[in-house]
Each structure stands twice: as structure tokens, then as C-alpha cells.
Amino acid sequence: MADLAECNIKVMCRFRPLNESEVNRGDKYIAKFQGEDTVVIASKPYAFDRVFQSSTSQEQVYNDCAKKIVKDVLEGYNGTIFAYGQTSSGKTHTMEGKLHDPEGMGIIPRIVQDIFNYIYSMDENLEFHIKVSYFEIYLDKIRDLLDVSKTNLSVHEDKNRVPYVKGCTERFVCSPDEVMDTIDEGKSNRHVAVTNMNEHSSRSHSIFLINVKQENTQTEQKLSGKLYLVDLAGSEKVSKTGAEGAVLDEAKNINKSLSALGNVISALAEGSTYVPYRDSKMTRILQDSLGGNCRTTIVICCSPSSYNESETKSTLLFGQRAKTIKNTVCVNVELTAEQWKKKYEKEKEKNKILRNTIQWLENELNRWRNGETVPIDEQFDKEKANLEAFTVDKDITLTNDKPATAIGVIGNFTDAERRKCEEEIAKLYKQLDDKDEEINQQSQLVEKLKTQMLDQEELLASTRRDQDNMQAELNRLQAENDASKEEVKEVLQALEELAVNYDQKSQEVEDKTKEYELLSDELNQKSATLASIDAELQKLKEMTNHQKKRAAEMMASLLKDLAEIGIAVGNNDVKQPEGTGMIDEEFTVARLYISKMKSEVKTMVKRCKQLESTQTESNKKMEENEKELAACQLRISQHEAKIKSLTEYLQNVEQKKRQLEESVDALSEELVQLRAQEKVHEMEKEHLNKVQTANEVKQAVEQQIQSHRETHQKQISSLRDEVEAKAKLITDLQDQNQKMMLEQERLRVEHEKLKATDQEKSRKLHELTVMQDRREQARQDLKGLEETVAKELQTLHNLRKLFVQDLATRVKKSAEIDSDDTGGSAAQKQKISFLENNLEQLTKVHKQLVRDNADLRCELPKLEKRLRATAERVKALESALKEAKENASRDRKRYQQEVDRIKEAVRSKNMARRGHSAQIAKPIRPGQHPAASPTHPSAIRGGGAFVQNSQPVAVRGGGGKQV
């Protein structure tokens, strides 16, 4: 770098005109100007490098503020221009203005045009590379305006301790149009909002960075300069702007960052030893612009309205403090090998002279310590030492083939000492001639070693960062692996439990199949008994038909007798009373017989009521049994095979009940016929005075009724036996369920032990580098398995609810039917129909359960396959973890060997890379404006020629091409 020089920060003050709202409000214009560098506010003067009044044009502001910085940047200096002020004070108008309006454009578009114009007028031996970046600081986060996906960039420092934004997009440009297109693109992504004071209020600090690198193709001298163009967001008072919600949060962050900027300015102005650059990302980025290696110009924008007087004073005070800050600037130059060599030789000679001076002073000190008195003319003299240094430096510049002249020795030596020194000097110059080539080689070697050292340091730092990142990633993957192991083990345990339950269910299905076979045998026996009963019923039907015929014959004879008696009564009046008396007597006998029959019927009704009460009790017991059966069925819902056997048994019961219904219908018909026959027989017996025959008929009827009663009683007893059998079956099922619960508890204890064992084993796993994709696949498979099991459980639960609802509905209907009709045969029919409905519903439930069982059996192979696949994945994960550990140990052993190769690769990569992203460099040559389209990679030639090509194009003066 060149020699250092100090310069103050330049502060320019600009006042905007009163806006429409301020004029409508009647605000006063409070600014008074004294000359071109002073403004008076409330009788207090504020002096700056330049003060611009409200009528100043954009071009005049640019010429005074920024035009000189263009030359500085192209000569290798860093430059910064930023606008500061309250909201709606004209900062964005000053920095950007109307980008494509020749009169209204601000500093940024004008300075871009001037940079290229200045380049075109420079020496043709210079070659320029220009790249631009555009980012904003929004909510104290750095956001790339050229790539909106980069929303939180970080600030780092390069090897020279200069801050830069890491990862920010850098674009190479070769014409003003390309730069303006980049600005338009970034501006469209910037955050703006509407407030009470500004319709286009900037909600972020925007920074447009232009990086210019130039190289002299003849002297190989390289210069670089950076230009920061900053448009700060304005400070806000919430009471004036009316900010709410997100706009209020933005205002808080804006005021916070501007406060940090004010603290930095104050610390620099006061000469504080500590400057709080790190309080804000904005001050961190502008660290070199404030008190560092940069020529900085601050444009403070103020409002002349009395409404904003306090904010205007605060802005002016900020500018006055900033004006006192001094920056130390120097040219950013990259020395060539020859320049480094000359500098090395110069420093080496200075070091040699200093050694001689030290030796002289040590000799003089030793003489003083030994008690000698050194004369004044032999004592050390600084002027003589400087003369000696000048003489030595002058002699070094001579060519090596010229004879060396003796250097006068400082002090008054004896002749012998002087001759000795001259001989020694001659020898030294001869050695210098011999060592010139060695010095050149050493200087080149030093340059290479420095480059290698820097590369190694950078590589070591990047390797350490990569190692830390890999270690963090490894720890995270290890934690995820542990969690996935736990999940897989839990799922495996659940699958094992399902497999055990399935085996138990299969055993129970076999048991129930055997029970079903036994019940089938019993059903065959019952069918044989039912066949015998059918034969007896057939005999009864034949007897009834015979009695019907006999009763019909007796009725016909009785009608004939009654007709004859009627004729006799009608023809013989004397016999009419007798006939009447005989008829009355016969009716009396009939009434007596009927009254007897009524009494018998009443007794039968009482007996029927008793039977009904008994049947009601039995129904209640049946309901209780049905409730118990429902509870059993809820348990049986988990044991599908048991439900199958019970439903088959209920089908058999349904057949029996249907047969009983048919027999009851036949018996009821016979009972009606018998009652009619009884009436006929009574009339016949009364008419013919055959009481004995009537008694026999009555006894026969009573015998038939008694047989019917006994048959009904047998049916009731058989139903009771069946209920008792079902109760016994329910008790057995409860015992089996209790055993299963005990078995489940034992399995749970074993599960806890296995789980503890698995947890102890899982602690031994420490590292996992790969297999993330396989773990995700296993998780998806397990998720599908869980969904399948959940669906099956939900189906069983729905079936249980439907069964309970249907059973409750049937019980309710049965109670209503019993309360509505208490007749004998009708009540039996309703109960039989109720049982039929129950049986149909149970049949449907049974079929549904059979289908569900079949579906579960179909799903079982899939689940077993998934279980095996999961086990294989677990084994693969364990083997992969083991391999990862082995690979890690091998990698550590090969680390030293790999470092050397990585250094070479990184060094070549760094030489080829010119930024954070790979782009095509577009060199620019002075000579003439470009004529190529900005959409194609092109370069500029002096004389007006240009070339379009897919590769970077270099341009030289004179119109010649160079690809």
C-alpha cells in the first residue's frame, strides 16, 4: 500500500422545499443561509463543507458532493457517500432521484455514468473489472436485493480485517446500462411503506457497492477501489408518522440502527478508545467508512418546516460531530514481484545500517563502562549516522559492475583501523555482487512462502469451520438416530404383541370350531326330536279333521231336529208354549253349558296369565342374559372366532323358533275349531239330553288343552335350559378373559424388561453419518402400519357400538310390544317375530365380523413383511453405523495426507475465483464508449470496434481485436 494520509469526513447539508402537507398546515420556513457553507436555525449557525438551498438542482448537488470521489475510486482509494436525515427529508431523492430522467436523477445513476466516462478517457494500457452488489438492512437483517432467497446474510472480515457481507450476490458489469438494470432489479425488491409523513417511505437501509479493480498491462501494477452508496432509512417519531403493526416494528429497528450510528459518530468525534461498531450490522459494514481507510461524504438532508424543527436540529448536530472525524486513507495497491524485491532490499540495507549503529553504540558504551573517556569527536553523532546511511543507500543504487567506493567511517579512527575497514568494505561489496542472484531467488521464495502461508491459514480456518459443522451435524444425526431407534423398537414391540395376540386368537378359533361341531351334533339330535313332534302333530290334525266331520254331522242333525220342532210349534198352537218352554229349556241348558265353559275359560286365562308372568320373568332373565351376552360380545369382538360359533348356534335357535311358530299357529287354529265344535256339541247334547256325550267331549277337549299346555311347558323348560347353557358359556368366556388379562400383564412385565434391555443397548451407539433417507422410509412404512391397525381398531369399535344400539332398540321394542298386547297367541307371535329380528341382526353382524376377519388375515402377510423389512432396516442401520465409525477412524489417519492435496486444490480454486459466486469477468479497456448490446458478454475497443462472443472479450486501443 501507499503512504497513509489523513482527511476529514466531508459533510454536505441539503434542505428540501416545503411539501404540500406542510404548506397546507401553514408551517414556517425556518432555515436561513449565510454564504455557501452556513445555515442558521433558531439564531444558531451550523457550518459545513457546503450547504444546499431548496432550489439547488440535482446536478449541482452531484458536482459538489460526489464528482471528485469518482477520480479517487479509480485511483485506488475507497469511497463512501451516504444520506442521513429524518423521514421524508429527501434522502432517497438525493441518492437515487428519478433513475432514468437526465435532470431528476440523483447521485447513484450520475456517478455510475461518470465512472465509465472516466474509464473511457484513461490510458489504454489499463484493464478494469467492475462488479456491483446491492443489499438492504431490514429489521437488522441483511437481505440481498439481487437474490431475494438470501434473507439473513452475515458480516465477516477478510485477511486485512476489512468487513464484508459474506454470500452477497456480485455481478460483473461492463456498461452503465447493465448497472442501471441491476439497480432497477434491486429497487423493485426493496421494502417501502406509506406513512403519514411520506407516501414512499424507505423501511430499510440500502447499500449499493461498486468494486473497481484495474491492472496496468505494461507495469502489471494492480489497484482496487470500493465505492459504497448508502441510502439510509429516516428516523421516525411514531406520534407523527402514525406507524402501526409491522410498520411500527420497522420504525423501531430503523431508530435503533440510527442510534447505533450516532453512538459511533460520537465516539469517533470524542476520540474514544472504544468505538461500538458491532452494535449494529449497518455500522459494522460501514466500519471502514467511519474512521478507517475511506474518503467519506455525508449528505445530511433536512426539513425546513417549523413542524420538524427538533428533528432538523438533531440532524445538523449529527453532521457537525461527523465533520470532526478523520479518516486515514491510502491507495489499495498490489505490489508486483519486482516492487516487493526492491522494498525488501531497501529494508534489508536499513536493517544493516541499524546493526552497525547498534554495534558502534555498544562499543562506545563498553569504553565508558571500562573507565575510558570517549572524546566528543569519537562519540555517536546522529547527523553523521544519517550521512552514513545516505552514503550506503546511494552506493547500493549503483550498478554491480562499477567498483565500489569506500564508505567513510564515522569518527576519528587510526590509519590501521581505517585501512582495515576499507578492506572489509571491499570484501563486502564483492560478496554483494556474488549474492545478487541469491537475493533475487530469496525474495521470490519469500513471496511464495507468504502466499503459501496465507493459503494454509485460510485452508486451516476453513477446515476447522468445516470440522465444527460436521461435528455439529454428526451430533444432530446421532440424536436423531437414537430417537429413531426408540421409535423402531416401540413399533417392533407393538408388532410382537399383535403377533402373540393373533396366535392366541387362532387357538381360540380352533377351540370354537370344536364347540361348533358339538353344537352341530346337538342340533341334529334336536332335529330328530322335532321330526317326531311333527309326526305327532300330523296325527292330531287327522283326529281334528275327524272330529270336525263328526261335529258337522251332529250340527246338521241338530238343525233338522230344530226345524222339525219349529214346524211342530208353528202348526200346533197348544204345543207352542211347550215348544217355547222346550226351546227356553234348551237355551237354558246351553247357557248353563256356556257359563261352565266361561268359567273354564277364565281358569284357562288365569293359567295363561300365570304362564305369561312366568314367561315375563323368563323374558327378563333372557334380557339379563342378553345384556350379559352383549358384554360377552364386546369381549368377543376381540376374539372373532367365538362370535362365529355363537351366531351359528343362534341360527339353529332361529330354525327351532320358526318351527315352534308354525306349531303354535296350527294349534291356535285347532283351538278355534275345537271351540266351535264344543258349542255345537253342547247344543247337540242339550237338545238330545246326551249329557254324558257332552261330558266326554268336554273331557276330550280338556285333554287336548292339557296336552297343549304340557307341550308349551316343555318348550319353556327347553328355553330355560338353553338360557342356562348360555349363562354357563358366558361364565366360561369370562374365565378365559381373566386368564388372558393375566397373560397380558405377564407379557407387559416381560415387555418392560425387554424395553430396559433395549435401552441399555441403545446407549452404546454414538455416531451416525449417513442413512437419513432410509430412516425416513422406515418412518413412512411404520406410519402406514399404524394407520392400518388404527383403522381395524376403529372398525371393531364401530361394530361394537352398532351392536349395542341395535340390542337396546330391540329391548325397547320388546317392552312396548309386551305392554301393548297381553293376549296369548298374539303375544307369542310378537315375541317370536322379535326373536327373528334379533337373529337376523346377529346374522348380519356375524357376516360382517367374518368379512373383517378375512380382511385381517389378508393384511397379516403384509404386516409380517413390513416387520421383516423393518428388522432388516435396523440391521442395515447398525451395520452402516459401524462402517461410519470405521470410515471416521480411517479418515482421521489419512487426514495429514489429505490436507496437502486439499491445500493445492483450494489454492488453485482461490486463484480462479474472484468473488463469492462464479461469474464471467468482463474486462473494460479505456479508449471509447461501448457499442455492444448489454445483453451479450462483450468488451470495448478504441476506435469503435466491438466483438460479441460467448466468452469474455478483452479490448485494446486502436480498434484491434483481441479475443
UniProtKB/Swiss-Prot annotation:
It is a peripheral membrane protein. Microtubule-dependent motor required for normal distribution of mitochondria and lysosomes. Can induce formation of neurite-like membrane protrusions in non-neuronal cells in a ZFYVE27-dependent manner. Regulates centrosome and nuclear positioning during mitotic entry. During the G2 phase of the cell cycle in a BICD2-dependent manner, antagonizes dynein function and drives the separation of nuclei and centrosomes. Required for anterograde axonal transportation of MAPK8IP3/JIP3 which is essential for MAPK8IP3/JIP3 function in axon elongation. GO terms for cellular component: axon cytoplasm; centriolar satellite; ciliary rootlet; cytolytic granule membrane; cytoplasm; cytosol; dendrite cytoplasm; kinesin complex. Composed of three structural domains: a large globular N-terminal domain which is responsible for the motor activity of kinesin (it hydrolyzes ATP and binds microtubule), a central alpha-helical coiled coil domain that mediates the heavy chain dimerization; and a small globular C-terminal domain which interacts with other proteins (such as the kinesin light chains), vesicles and membranous organelles. InterPro entries: Kinesin-like_fam, Kinesin_motor_CS, Kinesin_motor_dom, Kinesin_motor_dom_sf, P-loop_NTPase. One of its GO terms (biological process) is regulation of membrane potential. It is found in: Cytoplasm, Cytoskeleton; Cytolytic granule membrane; Lysosome membrane. GO terms for molecular function: ATP binding; ATP hydrolysis activity; cadherin binding; identical protein binding; microtubule binding; microtubule motor activity; plus-end-directed microtubule motor activity; protein-containing complex binding. Residues 908-963 are annotated as: Disordered. Residues 329-914 form a coiled coil. Transmembrane segments: none annotated. The modification N-acetylalanine is found at A2. Belongs to the TRAFAC class myosin-kinesin ATPase superfamily. Kinesin family. Kinesin subfamily. The modification Omega-N-methylarginine is found at R956. Gene3D superfamilies: 6.10.250.1590, Kinesin motor domain (3.40.850.10). There is a cross-link at K213 (Glycyl lysine isopeptide (Lys-Gly) (interchain with G-Cter in SUMO2)). The keyword Magnesium does not apply. This is Kinesin-1 heavy chain.
